[in-house]
A protein has these predicted regions:
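Integrase module of LTR retroelements
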Residues: 1-200
């Protein structure tokens, strides 16, 4: 668990992203938030967006943000039976996974920011979808496939296979175009990272 901060404020008032990554499947949730959210608001969002879909985790690793070290946050997780651990600087098991995910998310946002014209929070679900349906070398598959045991049906494929039925559906067309754009940006960013690593 970690936050991406310093983002431009959207018309909805969101200015940060709460990143939550499953250690086993590498699946991630990107939740648009206001940096001013209280720990109580974060706890409500956590139950609504994480616990309801995945149940209560055995353990959580987060950075040492004051909200995660607060008495309230600790008591909520103690009541749920979740062990809290805090990342230690330069310890790859605790801080590496979220940091890599956040770096990928930041790269995706930077690549798409001009295309989304200040409404990054509206496209965040599609960015999350694209991230979770992209191949991860560390697990040998996409996080979605690791989580659900099958590949995900994608709007990109809906458009390609049933084009005649869906052409009139503007929402599907816009969603498909956004997912394709995000995937292209991800590929470009990934190529740049690979090129940089290869030069080392």
């Amino acid at each position: 668990m970690d936050f991406v901060v310093g983002l431009p404020r959207t018309p909805s008032g969101n200015d940060a992203i709460w990143v939550i990554v499953d250690r086993l499947t590498k699946s991630a949730h990107f939740l648009a938030i206001k940096l001013s959210f209280s720990v109580e608001q974060l706890a409500e969002l956590y139950v609504a967006q994480i616990v309801r879909y995945h149940g209560i985790p055995k353990s959580i690793i987060s950075d040492r943000d004051g909200r995660f070290t607060s008495k309230f946050w600790r008591s909520v997780h103690q009541a749920m039976g979740t062990k809290l651990a805090f990342s230690t600087a330069f310890h790859p098991q605790t801080d590496g996974q979220s940091e890599r995910t956040i770096q990928t998310l930041e790269d995706m946002l930077r690549a798409c920011i001009m295309d989304f014209k200040g409404t990054w929070d509206k496209k965040l679900p599609l960015i999350e979808f694209s991230y979770n349906n992209s191949f991860h070398a560390s697990i040998g598959m996409a996080p979605y496939e690791a989580l659900y045991g099958r590949r995900c049906r994608s709007p990109v494929h809906w458009y390609e296979t049933r084009e005649k039925e869906l052409v009139s559906t503007d929402f599907i067309r816009r969603t498909t175009e956004a997912v394709k754009l995000i995937r292209r940006r991800m590929e470009t960013t990934s190529s740049r990272h690979k090129s940089y690593v290869d030069k080392r």
